[in-house]
């Protein structure tokens, strides 16, 4: 997925306006609720998958860090995700989960920005999360 300079500007603009940890925790809760099988690698959460729960908050911090890296390297997300991709493969994360989280983020962005989440912003965010999913899947074999 190629991120154009125009889309990169949209992405950095969106990312700068978010309460990143809150938005990420809500996106994670949405994934865990809609796709309950995604919780299988989070046994330490003891069945607590709400945005405000400590396990979700802790994982949200990690996801925010990974997304911060992607935003800083929009034109080469794969390179920044090599080790993280290897780690996710090692622990057995299904690559489809990355796409599901991206879809949940799109819902959260639409809820947050309402009419401000224009088709152009939606397209940029969609491509960003597709690129992130690709980067996180890049070392799977």
UniProtKB/Swiss-Prot annotation:
Domain Globin residue range list? 2-141
One GO cellular component term:
hemoglobin complex
PROSITE patterns noted in UniProt: GLOBIN (PS01033)
Domain of life (superkingdom): Eukaryota
List the keywords (alphabetical). Answer: Heme, Iron, Metal-binding, Oxygen transport, Transport
Spell out the subunit comment.
Answer: Heterotetramer of two alpha chains and two beta chains.
Family according to the record: Belongs to the globin family.
Q: In which tissues is it expressed?
A: Red blood cells.
Q: Which Pfam families match?
A: Globin
Q: What GO biological process term is on the record, naming one?
A: hydrogen peroxide catabolic process
Sum up the protein's function in the record's words: Involved in oxygen transport from gills to the various peripheral tissues.
Q: Do the record's keywords include Metal-binding?
A: yes
Q: Per the record's keyword annotation, is Transport included, yes or no?
A: yes
Q: Which residues bind heme b?
A: 59, 88
Q: What is this protein called?
A: Hemoglobin subunit beta
Q: Which GO terms fall under molecular function for this chain's record?
A: haptoglobin binding; heme binding; metal ion binding; organic acid binding; oxygen binding; oxygen carrier activity; peroxidase activity
């Amino acid at each position: 997925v190629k991120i154009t300079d125009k889309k990169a500007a949209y992405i950095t603009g969106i990312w700068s306006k978010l309460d990143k940890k809150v938005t990420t925790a809500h996106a994670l809760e949405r994934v865990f609720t809609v796709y309950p099988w995604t919780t299988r690698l989070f046994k330490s959460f003891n069945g607590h998958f709400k945005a405000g729960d400590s396990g979700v908050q802790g994982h949200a911090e990690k996801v925010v860090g990974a997304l911060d890296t992607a935003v800083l390297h929009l034109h080469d997300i794969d390179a920044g995700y090599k080790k993280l991709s290897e780690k996710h493969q090692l622990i057995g994360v299904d690559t489809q989960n990355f796409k599901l989280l991206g879809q949940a983020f799109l819902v959260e962005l639409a809820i947050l920005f309402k009419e401000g989440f224009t088709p152009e912003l939606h397209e940029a965010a969609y491509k960003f999360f597709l690129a992130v999913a690709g980067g996180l899947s890049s070392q799977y074999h």
